[in-house]
């Protein structure tokens, strides 16, 4: 047990966390020098989406050997929508590597994960990365990191953190920035020296806290976590102590640990190690696996509650089934059920309508990632606008989720940001100026956060950073105006014609190009005014045997407005859907027929309350 180290790596997007892990795995000999690492860099980001978006979504494990030590690494997601992942990881580790860019310094998302780590009592090592960059300023960054620790109420012991200067790209680490170095051995030594051995007891009964789940078609659910005490062998009788008080008896059918990124099957495991065990089909994150049904469960950090819900519906549009193979309600429900086996922060439920399902999560990004994964797997699905989950207090008053928002923005963007926040009913709690940056802390309703990330990118030209945590359920703060513009809605089925689109674009911005398939009820553009207008984008120019004066003049169409999935989900109104298929993203009305839409609007009931 003294030769095991469990560490997490914390870093802001693009500060080189994943590259650093690649470097550690290569230099520790986990990958042979001539072995191709899946022919691409960034080994830890194994999901396609993670590579594309440059973010870590799922917490993943890796491990390497250094001298006699077995070092387990857990990669932490930095995005606050995946906060559920971060909190669980903290139970497994004893120390953290805080990776900070030598030019940019610590950012808002680093703060979110670091706070959780310090609260859990983890021992930090600060790694100042990318010191090979021309404009690197490691000394200033070190001062900023120290200030960050102080502002997060770190203990005196945590404030006395060791610092290692690295270039993960070039593959070297230094303790003294002036002394040349050729490899990462100083960082390996620091991990072994400063990070304590796991908090665990060797001699007593076997207990393990489940922090992550995986699924295998042969073994069923595999529960990953740290062994807090005792040891376990394949074939041992075991018990699972569930969160709701139930207890299930079973048998350990397989044990895994990590070497590099591979899961290696082993026959027994001891206290302090991070392993996966199979044998319990209905085990869930936060539950305890132990050797006997009479044992007490281990304490568990509760995960932030879901605060947002969306509806997933079967694609019933005229173009359904042209792109995707998996289009029925059964396919969607099976995929959602599979997702919640491993994704703890999601909840799913069926509704009164057989082809509509509710999906609740921590934020729109998290649910958008799920929709994007489903598209790639061949699903077609309709997704509604995110709605917040309300609660009622004992007196029957409405309570809505309030989030704590952390913003880091350039000084010149402060005015527009404050104006935007006040329109979203945010209360500014704290503001801090440092150099050309401003850090803002605010309490904002979850409704106000929907669509804020896109606004932030526009207001700060991509330089703003945000993260948010669940704060409390508070009184309803009144109406927030979401979108001021109405939609241009097609009243015909057919193909978009440039002649017709030329007339439609006088009313607002187009979202389609000539030649695209269109159907009744599909949104083809954004109206310049607040109301919806039915338009006919499929009208062809009548041919006559008389030439008019305008003949031969080319029609000039503005480039259409194209949206990413996240942006589309924020953009649509409450009576609209995003139609996500493997090849297309379309916006449409929930009710396609115009007359039925008008009737529904007249008889629309007041806003439903989620108890």
Q: Which role fits each region the language model picked out?
A:
Residues 1-611:
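Structural and coupling elements of P-loop NTPases
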């Amino acid at each position: 047990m003294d030769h095991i180290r469990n560490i997490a790596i914390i870093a802001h997007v693009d500060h080189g966390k994943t590259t650093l892990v690649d470097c550690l795995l290569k230099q520790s000999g986990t990958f042979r020098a001539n072995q191709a690492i899946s022919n691409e860099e960034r080994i830890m980001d194994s999901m396609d989406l993670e590579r594309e978006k440059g973010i870590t979504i799922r917490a993943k494990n890796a491990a390497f050997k250094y001298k006699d030590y077995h070092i387990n690494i857990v990669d932490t997601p930095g995005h606050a929508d995946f906060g559920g992942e971060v909190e669980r990881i903290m139970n497994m580790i004893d120390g953290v590597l805080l990776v900070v860019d030598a030019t940019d310094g610590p950012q808002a998302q680093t703060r979110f994960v670091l706070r959780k780590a310090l609260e859990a009592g983890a021992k930090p090592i600060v790694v100042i990365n990318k010191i090979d960059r021309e404009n690197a300023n490691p000394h200033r960054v070190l001062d900023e990191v120290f200030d960050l620790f102080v502002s997060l109420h770190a203990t005196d012991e945590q404030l006395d953190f060791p610092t290692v200067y690295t270039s993960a790209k070039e593959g070297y680490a230094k303790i003294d920035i002036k002394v040349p170095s050729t490899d990462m051995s100083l960082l390996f030594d620091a991990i072994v020296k400063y990070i304590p051995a796991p908090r665990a007891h060797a001699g007593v009964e076997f207990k393990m806290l489940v922090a992550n789940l995986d699924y295998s078609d042969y073994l069923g659910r595999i529960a990953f976590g740290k062994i807090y005490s005792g040891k376990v062998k394949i074939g041992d009788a075991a018990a699972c102590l569930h969160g709701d008080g139930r207890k299930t008896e079973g048998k350990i059918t397989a044990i895994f640990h990590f070497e590099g990124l591979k899961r290696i099957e082993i026959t027994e495991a001891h206290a302090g190690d991070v392993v996966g065990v199979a044998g319990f089909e209905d085990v869930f994150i936060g539950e305890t696996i132990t050797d006997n049904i009479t044992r007490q469960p281990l304490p568990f950090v509760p995960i932030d509650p879901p605060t947002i819900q969306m509806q997933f519906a079967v694609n019933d549009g005229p173009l359904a089934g042209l792109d995707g193979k998996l289009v029925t309600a059964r396919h969607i429900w099976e995929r959602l059920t599979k997702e919640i086996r491993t994704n703890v922060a999601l909840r799913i439920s069926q509704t009164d309508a057989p082809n509509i399902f509710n999906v609740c999560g921590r934020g729109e990004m998290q649910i958008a990632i799920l929709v994007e994964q489903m598209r790639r797997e061949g699903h077609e699905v309709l997704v509604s606008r995110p709605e917040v989950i309300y609660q009622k207090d004992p007196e029957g008053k409405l309570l809505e989720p309030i989030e704590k928002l952390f913003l880091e923005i350039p000084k010149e963007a402060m005015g527009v940001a404050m104006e935007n926040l006040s329109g979203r009913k945010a209360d500014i709690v704290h503001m801090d100026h440092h150099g050309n940056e401003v850090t803002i802390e605010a309490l904002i309703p979850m409704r106000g956060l929907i669509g804020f990330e896109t606004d932030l990118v526009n207001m700060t030209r991509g330089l703003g950073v945000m993260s948010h945590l669940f704060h409390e359920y508070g009184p309803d703060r009144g109406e927030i105006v979401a979108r001021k513009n109405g939609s241009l809605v097609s009243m015909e089925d057919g193909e978009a014609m440039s002649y017709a689109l030329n007339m439609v674009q006088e009313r607002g911005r187009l979202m389609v190009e000539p030649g695209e398939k269109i159907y009744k009820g599909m949104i083809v553009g954004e109206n310049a005014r607040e109301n919806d207008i039915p338009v006919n984008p499929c009208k062809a120019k009548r041919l006559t045997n008389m030439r008019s004066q305008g003949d031969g003049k080319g029609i000039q169409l503005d480039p259409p407005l194209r949206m990413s999935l996240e942006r589309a989900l924020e953009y649509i109104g409450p009576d609209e859907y995003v139609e996500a298929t493997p090849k297309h993203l379309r916006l449409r009305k929930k009710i396609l027929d115009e007359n039925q839409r008008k009737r529904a609007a007249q008889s629309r009931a007041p806003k439903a309350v989620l108890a």
